[in-house]
Regions:
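Secondary-structure boundary elements
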Residues: 289-362
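Secondary-structure capping and boundary motifs in well-ordered enzyme cores
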Residues: 143, 326, 330, 359-370, ...
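Sec/Tat-exported extracytoplasmic proteins
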Residues: 80, 159, 321, 338-342, ...
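A carboxyl-terminal module marker
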Residues: 509-670
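Bacterial Sec-dependent N-terminal signal peptides
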Residues: 1-23, 670
Length: 670
């Protein structure tokens, strides 16, 4: 009996080991049969296994290279998970040096008549591209992916940039069942490793040290007719520090609305070089300050030198400025000139790609090409303009001083004790506005004397939307009326992005679709092209079914299609802070003329709401004057950050708004 028991235990162990075989190509039938994730059934895909190994390779010809080897196995549960079948690698280059991608291998596995079949990733499905002179991309999409497939791929990166180990992502928006991290660093490189402090997960790093021996045998030949051979044995010996993580069941990073950039909260292993100390060489300290980082960036020829160039634009700019004396007028004219002259090529960066002169001539450039040109023009016009370094939302919030902490640059103009931001990459941006991607907490302004300091990016004026409805309810209880609306700030920008390229019929159709069952006529929009002016919009409308007739009573929602009916905050709890896009204010005024065959039975009560210690307000006021009703609402959100512990209060604030917005006026027939 004891032997049978031991045999059973051994069998279970063997079966379990077989199911957990993560060697490349060893996908099991059990993995393919799995219909949903056992611990998170709602996910569309899951990483069954991820291996990320980093080490330094050495040879006597080229010295050290930094090698990264990645192997991932991913289960696709449904069609929504197909996006995980495409992998894009973006790598650095500098001059003739670049990160080389090699050894890309991939297989898609599926079951066919009970047998495991696979389709191999073909070379013609791997695409390599030079994004700009600083970045390359390698993209591949796994073949023949179906619901239930398992995909597997591996690749190797060989980098000449020895002092830069890429951050290692330890958490995805899908679960990771098994994670293995192994980083080996020679004693000559001293890195500080730490985790993203905003992440909710904790990981343990196992550290160990061993002696690494490298042996190189060189054969030489000498002599004329008589040849002699000698073998030279070169040995290099050094300590190698190993950092390992072996973790199972890493939960998915849950996306929450109004979270900013989700990966800011992902578990990440971050590497910062402290120093290098090679034999027979002086120790070099790489620890930096933010002042030092800013100075190095400014002194780079593709940054500071570009700010000094002006001859290429002087004649055109002189013509534009000759009748202007007020600084605000100069700012507006120069800003609009740059936006019209140079189109953004969708690439970020604080170093120029084409260079400001070629970008001006060709009409296209990256962020630095455009905004360093803008700064140079502003300075030429006598304004105090300086570059502001930014980390975009998808680049995260910089945690320690490094040039990689920034990836964007805008102009900052100091005028009347105010810092005015300008970004020429978006034709719909107004003076003083930053695009959402660049509104990421703090930027670093660098002055001409190389001094620098942090500046707030999240402030700015409140974006306002003011709407007035004048409505007549006829004796058949149908609505007809006119709406006038004024939009500024980001509300105006959003309108221009969505409507500027549409013809009138297309605009009416889009407005009708977004405003319930109204029928629109006489649409008029002003200041669409004048970006520095507010959008003014008006149209007439009919709404046949705006009131509900039950017996002798008529029920109507006085806000009609302006009603907020859905709470953006639905989840029971909150892991991450709520970050609204910008301060905002929405003011609605509805004037209703009632027919003579009804009288008011009941009206919603007036209400005012606020959140303690927040610049947040909601007001709802109803006034009756005979057959005329006026309903006024205001929602002002000047506070854009709410911590998780404030989530319940914010959620309830919106619940109360929705309850009030859905209250109805009751009329009675006379």
């Amino acid at each position: 009996m004891k032997k049978i028991y031991l045999l059973a235990l051994m069998l279970i162990f063997v079966l379990n080991t077989a199911a957990q075989d993560f060697r490349y190509g060893k996908v099991s039938e059990e993995e393919l049969l799995e219909k949903q994730h056992p611990k998170d059934p709602e996910v569309n895909a899951a990483v069954l296994y991820k291996s990320h190994k980093v080490h330094y390779d050495y040879n006597s010809i080229n010295g050290f290279s930094l090698i990264t080897e990645v192997h991932e196995r991913i289960k696709i549960y449904n069609k929504e998970g197909f996006e995980w079948a495409t992998k894009k690698l973006v790598n650095s280059k500098s001059g003739s040096d670049e990160v080389k991608v090699s050894g890309i291998d991939g297989e898609t596995y599926h079951l066919e008549n009970g047998k495991v079949k696979s389709d191999r990733l073909r070379n013609d499905a791997i695409f390599k591209d030079d994004l700009n002179k600083y970045l390359t991309s390698t993209t591949f999409t796994m073949p023949s992916v179906l619901e239930g497939s398992v995909i597997e791929y591996k690749y190797t990166l060989r980098s000449p940039f020895l002092i830069s180990i890429d951050d290692i992502l330890l958490q995805y928006t899908i679960p990771i069942n098994n994670l293995e991290i192994d980083v080996k660093i020679p004693e000559f490189f001293v890195f500080w490793s730490h985790f993203n402090p905003r992440a909710k997960l904790e990981f343990k790093i196992d550290r160990s040290t061993k002696i690494f021996r490298y042996t190189n045998l060189q054969t030489t030949r000498s002599g004329g007719i008589a040849v002699s051979h000698s073998i030279k044995n070169n040995k290099i010996e050094f300590l190698e520090n190993t950092y390992s993580i072996d973790k199972k069941d890493i939960p998915a990073l849950i996306n929450e609305n109004h979270v900013g950039y989700l990966n800011n909260y992902a578990a990440v292993l971050i590497w910062e070089l402290q120093l290098t100390n090679f034999p027979n060489s002086t120790m070099e300290n790489y620890t930096q300050t933010w002042d030092g980082v800013a100075k190095k960036i400014y002194d780079h020829p593709e940054f500071g030198n570009e700010l000094d160039k002006s001859r290429y634009f002087e004649s055109e700019l002189d013509d534009l400025l000759k009748n202007l004396s007020l600084p605000k007028d100069k700012i507006s004219v120069i800003f609009n000139f740059v936006k019209a002259k140079v189109k953004w090529n969708d690439y970020a960066g604080y170093y120029t790609d084409n260079g400001v002169k070629d970008a001006f001539k060709d009409g296209a450039g990256n962020v630095a090409d455009i905004n360093l040109m803008l700064i140079a023009m502003l300075k030429y016009a006598g304004l105090k303009a300086d570059p502001v370094l930014i980390s975009t939302r998808d680049n995260g919030v910089p945690l320690y001083p490094t040039r990689n902490g920034f990836n964007y640059v805008v102009a900052g103009v100091s005028l009347n004790n105010e810092l005015i931001f300008l970004d020429g990459t978006d034709k719909y941006l107004e003076v003083g506005m930053l695009p959402y991607r660049a509104r990421n907490w703090q930027g670093r302004i660098i002055r001409e004397d190389r001094s620098s300091e942090w500046v707030d990016l999240m402030g700015g004026s409140t974006s306002e939307k003011t709407t007035r409805l004048n409505i007549k309810l006829d004796d058949q209880f149908h609505f007809e009326g006119q709406i006038t609306e004024e939009l500024d700030g980001f509300y105006a920008k959003t309108y221009r992005e969505g409507f500027a390229d549409l013809n009138n019929d297309e605009r009416i159709k889009k407005l009708e679709q977004s405003n319930g069952k109204i029928i629109i006529s006489d649409l008029d929009v002003q200041n669409e092209k004048e970006i520095d002016k507010n959008i003014k919009k008006s149209f007439k409308f009919e709404l046949p079914d705006g009131a509900e007739e039950i017996g002798n009573n008529i029920y109507l929602n006085p806000l009609l299609f302006l009603t907020t009916t859905s709470n953006p905050f639905k989840s029971e709890d909150r892991q991450f802070p709520v970050i609204l896009k910008y301060p905002s204010s929405i003011i609605n005024t509805v004037n209703i003329m009632l027919p003579n065959n009804v009288k008011v039975e009941s009206l919603p009560a007036n209400q005012a709401l606020s959140i303690n210690d927040k610049d947040v307000l909601f007001k709802y006021v109803v006034v009756q004057n005979g057959n005329f009703l006026r309903i006024s609402t205001e929602l002002t959100l000047n506070t854009i950050l709410y911590l998780p512990e404030e989530y319940e209060v914010l959620k309830e604030f919106y619940n109360q708004i929705i309850l009030k917005n859905t209250e109805r006026i009751v009329l009675i027939k006379t």
